[in-house]
Swiss-Prot record:
It comes from the Bacteria. Belongs to the UPF0225 family. The lineage of its organism: Bacteria, Pseudomonadati, Pseudomonadota, Gammaproteobacteria, Pseudomonadales. This is UPF0225 protein PSPPH_1399. HAMAP family: UPF0225. It comes from Pseudomonas savastanoi pv. phaseolicola (strain 1448A / Race 6). PANTHER family: ADENYLATE CYCLASE-ASSOCIATED CAP C-TERMINAL DOMAIN-CONTAINING PROTEIN, UPF0225 PROTEIN SCO1677.
Length: 157
């Protein structure tokens, strides 16, 4: 494994690339987290995929479905189109990418603009398939201690 190339497409060794994030080191930016999540799908690291999703959404994830999709797919590649901060707030970012894979139904390509938020030095993926339940004046679900309307509301809705 020490000489394995990272599946994220960087061309670097896994241990020097996404492997360190899988081992617990915080990803330094949203793009690195997104790349490490793609690599986690390739490697079947379901726990990592759950742990790097916004904490308030983790209980809404279907671990079995994630593991099954990961295992039943042959991952063909990742292309990152862009990575950008949102609204001048360095703790909010979008990453636009295309992931390709093959499964029992053929070859697939999925382009997505994913949302990420940083809290206490860690980046988290905001899963659009798991609803965020917060009123405008409620504490933000990202854990920032700001009101939802002043933090993630304009970013995730």
């Amino acid at each position: 494994m020490s000489s394995a190339i990272c599946p994220c497409g960087s061309g670097d060794l896994l241990l020097a690339c996404c492997g360190r994030y899988h081992a617990g080191q915080p990803a330094p930016c949203a793009e690195k987290l997104m790349r490490s999540r793609y690599s986690a799908y390739v490697l079947g690291l379901t726990d990592y995929l759950v742990q790097t999703t916004l904490p308030v959404q983790q209980s809404g994830l279907n671990r079995e479905a994630i593991a099954q999709w990961s295992a039943q797919s042959t991952w063909l590649g990742l292309e990152v189109e862009s990575s950008e901060v949102f609204g001048g707030k360095p703790e909010h970012a979008f990453v636009t990418f295309t992931a390709r894979w093959h499964d029992g139904n053929g070859e697939h390509s999925h382009k997505e603009r994913s949302s990420f938020v940083q809290n206490q030095g860690r980046w988290y993926f905001i899963d659009s398939t798991v609803p965020l339940k917060a009123g405008r004046n409620d504490a933000c679900p990202c854990g920032s201690e700001q009101k939802f309307k002043k933090c993630c509301s304009p970013y995730v809705v």
